[in-house]
From Swiss-Prot:
Positions of disulphide bridges: none
UniProt xrefs under InterPro entries: CitG, TriPribosyl-deP-CoA_syn_CitG
HAMAP family, per the entry: CitG (MF_00397)
Superkingdom classification of source: Bacteria
EC number: 2.4.2.52
Assigned protein family: Belongs to the CitG/MdcB family.
Alphabetized Pfam families for the sequence: CitG (PF01874)
Recorded name of the encoding gene: citG
Protein name according to UniProt: Probable 2-(5''-triphosphoribosyl)-3'-dephosphocoenzyme-A synthase
GO terms, biological process: prosthetic group biosynthetic process
Keywords of this entry: ATP-binding, Nucleotide-binding, Transferase
Length: 294
């Protein structure tokens, strides 16, 4: 019974990734229609990546459930070790292409936290239908003590390094903390902005319209390391401003699709891809499935 429930939840994480890549059009991003601003990956590359990651999603939630009483840092270390194996498997499946590195990190923590939370709230194991936004918030808050050390541990000693990952380079150059920062704050962008916005949208619109509007909203607010890495601070600010204007127009679904298709070409021409917004889109979908919003 327990394993079946945990398996079903891990499948929601996979479903969230499938919904994210399938939502179309997504400016600058891989979707069903084209590869966005990416010349090294396609929709099929994402499918390969998701198949590779899927067994690890189950391992994350089972680890959280099994070690719910463990010190947060110890649980984090278990999840990170699993996450590193998942990352290696992903790169093997994609021939070295980074499709989900940051999202895998976030999913490891959130699925681990979901497992730990379910171990402490056994009533949810028998009735996931009563999963609420308060449960979502509690899960995200569990990540904070697990990752309180993370910025200092991972980014506090970069002055001794000569070569950086692109995430480290963003921190050195701009102070952008990326997925580590989001996790160490308990995913506040997700709980304070993305999910409240989506709950409102889905109560007023059909699922596709709600998802497209959520993407635009996220592009208008997210500190997007992918955009900054590719185009710098000014390019990122420009995308945010453009998306704020698009939101203000309150377009019909048909007109919104047309506007996003046009903006897709704009971002392709500038080689810009809002990958940070895409990751938060997938994380929002995961909790939307748990809360039965979708």
């Amino acid at each position: 019974m327990t394993k079946a429930v945990l398996t079903s939840i891990s499948q929601l994480a996979l479903k969230a990734l499938l919904y994210e890549v399938s939502l179309s059009p997504k400016p600058g991003l891989v979707d069903r229609f084209d590869n966005g601003a990416h010349d090294d990956m396609s929709f099929m590359t994402f499918i390969d990546s998701m198949i590779a990651l899927s067994p690890f999603f189950q391992a994350y939630i089972e680890t959280g459930f099994a070690y719910a009483k463990e010190e947060p840092l110890l649980l984090f270390n278990r999840l990170r070790q699993l996450g590193q194996k998942a990352e290696e498997t992903m790169f093997c499946a994609t021939q070295g292409i980074n499709t989900h590195k940051g999202l895998n990190f976030s999913m490891a923590l959130l699925l681990g936290a979901t497992g730990a939370y379910l171990a402490r709230t056994p009533h949810l194991m028998t009735d996931l239908g009563c999963f609420s936004k308060e449960d979502t918030l509690a899960i995200c808050r569990l990540v904070k003590p697990m990752t309180a050390h993370l910025i200092q541990a991972d980014l506090g000693h970069l002055n001794t390094k000569k070569e950086f990952t692109y995430g480290e380079q963003l921190f050195v150059t701009y102070g952008i903390k990326g997925p580590r920062g989001e996790a160490s704050e308990g995913f506040t962008t997700l709980t304070n902005h993305a999910l409240p916005y989506f709950r409102q949208m889905i109560s007023q619109n059909d699922p596709e319209t709600s998802q497209l509007r959520l993407l635009v909203y996220l592009m208008s607010i997210v500190e997007d390391g992918n955009l900054i890495h590719r185009g710098g601070i000014e390019a990122w600010k420009g995308v945010k401003a453009d998306m704020r204007l698009l939101l203000q127009q309150d377009l019909s679904t048909t007109d919104l699709r047309l506007a996003l298709s046009s903006y897709n070409q704009c971002l392709i021409n500038q080689h810009l891809s809002p990958g940070g917004a895409a990751d938060l889109l997938a994380l929002t979908f995961y909790f939307a499935f748990l809360e039965k919003l979708l």
